Regions:
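Conserved P-loop NTPase-based nucleic-acid remodeling module centered on helicase motor cores
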Residues: 1-72
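Generic alpha-helix detector with strongest preference for long hydrophobic helices that associate
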Residues: 5-13, 29-30, 51-55, 85, ...
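Short, flexible active-site loop motifs that bind/organize anionic cofactors or intermediates
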Residues: 13, 35, 39, 60, ...
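Conserved helicase NTPase motor core
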Residues: 16, 91-163
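Weak global preference for isoleucine
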Residues: 27, 39, 52-53, 67, ...
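A short secondary-structure junction motif
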Residues: 27-31, 77, 81, 126, ...
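Coupling/switch/interface segments within P-loop NTPase motor domains and analogous charged loops
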Residues: 42-114
Length: 163
């Protein structure tokens, strides 16, 4: 899309192209001095979940499948804006899932890490709590074009409404 736009314009234009995650991570970099080192790597996330599962004595048939499913549920909770108290896990008892969710969040927080879902959650929180920062980004991006708008999730939609 960026190349097509540049070819049609035949000149440099002050237009930013990026995914939600790329744009929101850039915002968080400015606000919190994050770098790529602050993004939790897949192996860090899986190792964290292995430790939580062992600590909670959870049973499963296939470890990788179980962890993937739990991380998927954590992602669903973050992306939909559901309160953790109102979410019912498909993988384990609700009280256990809440512990897993909380411990996963604590691991990220203690290690100053964020996952891709946090990029959305933290940007939304930042904009809601800091009107000055929201205004600065509104001035930078006067217009937003979202490709495949029908595919965005709740938190992406909520952030767009803040603009």
């Amino acid at each position: 899309m960026k190349r097509r736009f540049q070819r049609k314009m035949n000149r440099l234009c002050p237009v930013t192209f990026g995914t939600f995650h790329a744009v929101y991570f850039a915002i968080l970099k400015h606000a919190y001095n994050y770098s790529a080192d602050n993004i939790a790597r897949e192996e860090q996330r899986y190792q964290c979940m292995r430790e939580i599962i062992a600590k909670e004595h959870l049973t499963y048939e296939d470890e990788t499948e179980f962890i993937t499913s739990l991380l998927g549920e954590i992602s669903l909770v973050k992306n939909s804006g559901i309160e953790i108290a109102n979410y019912y896990s498909k993988n384990c008892a609700e009280t256990v899932f809440r512990k897993v969710y909380r411990q996963y969040h604590e691991f990220l927080y203690k290690n100053r890490l964020i996952d891709f879902d946090d990029m959305l959650v933290y940007t939304k929180e930042l904009f809601e709590q800091r009107a000055d920062i929201l205004a600065a980004w509104q001035n930078k991006y006067r217009y937003i074009l979202i490709d495949e708008f029908q595919d965005i999730n709740r938190i992406q939609y909520d952030i767009c409404l803040l603009y």
